[in-house]
């Protein structure tokens, strides 16, 4: 769509003349309580200070307004949100594939990778895939999964252990143990 009107996104807080109440509970620039005043008086005080009158909680009776620099307020708010997002860790599920006949050397390499994933705080999905005649020896597959579970018992807790085979594979999910 070319040349369309660009709509200003709605502000989360009403400021200055957008405030509809007749009386407001006013808070000063430093956070001090200034009591309940008329809207015009609050606007005058904000203008004297050279900043905006921002409606903080519109549902209160009367609405709570604060004298502050709205641009700075939005900046601080967005900065705090970014900081929170930075602190959140996205848990990923890493997958390692085994076969019933996985030899000891390969097993150790895969186990090292599983340990690294769990230490990084990620979940690990162990897929045991059967081919051809291996389907007749499902017990070997369960033994492999039990061995993995026992080897990682210090680091991980089993989230789901396969009770039966799904198609041609068994899937076990491990989650890292919480650190004390």
From Swiss-Prot:
Q: Name one GO molecular function term.
A: ribosome binding
SUPFAM superfamilies xrefs: Translation initiation factor IF3, C-terminal domain, Translation initiation factor IF3, N-terminal domain
Q: Which HAMAP family match?
A: IF_3 (MF_00080)
Q: Which organism is it from?
A: Pectobacterium atrosepticum (strain SCRI 1043 / ATCC BAA-672)
InterPro entries xrefs: T_IF-3_C_sf (IPR036788), T_IF-3_N_sf (IPR036787), Translation_initiation_fac3_CS (IPR019813), Translation_initiation_fac_3 (IPR001288), Translation_initiation_fac_3_C (IPR019815), Translation_initiation_fac_3_N (IPR019814)
Q: Which Pfam families match?
A: IF3_C, IF3_N
User: Subunit info?
Assistant: Monomer.
Keyword Cytoplasm in annotation: yes
Q: Give the protein name, as stated in the record.
A: Translation initiation factor IF-3
């Amino acid at each position: 769509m070319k040349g369309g009107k660009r709509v200003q996104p709605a502000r989360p807080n009403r400021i200055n003349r957008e405030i509809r109440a007749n009386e407001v509970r006013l808070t000063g620039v430093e956070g001090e309580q200034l009591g309940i005043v008329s809207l015009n008086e609050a606007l005058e005080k904000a203008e004297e200070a050279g900043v905006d009158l921002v409606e903080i909680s519109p549902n209160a009776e009367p609405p709570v307004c604060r004298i502050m620099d709205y641009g700075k307020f939005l900046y601080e708010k967005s900065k705090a949100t970014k900081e929170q997002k930075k602190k959140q860790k996205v848990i990923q599920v890493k997958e390692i594939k085994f076969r019933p006949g996985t030899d000891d050397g390969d097993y150790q390499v895969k186990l090292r990778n599983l340990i690294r994933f769990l230490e990084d705080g990620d979940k690990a999905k162990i897929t045991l895939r059967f081919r051809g005649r291996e389907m007749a020896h499902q017990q070997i597959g369960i033994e492999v999964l039990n061995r993995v579970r026992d080897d990682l018992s210090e680091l991980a807790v089993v989230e789901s252990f396969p009770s039966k085979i799904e198609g041609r594979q068994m899937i076990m999910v491990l989650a890292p143990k919480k650190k004390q």
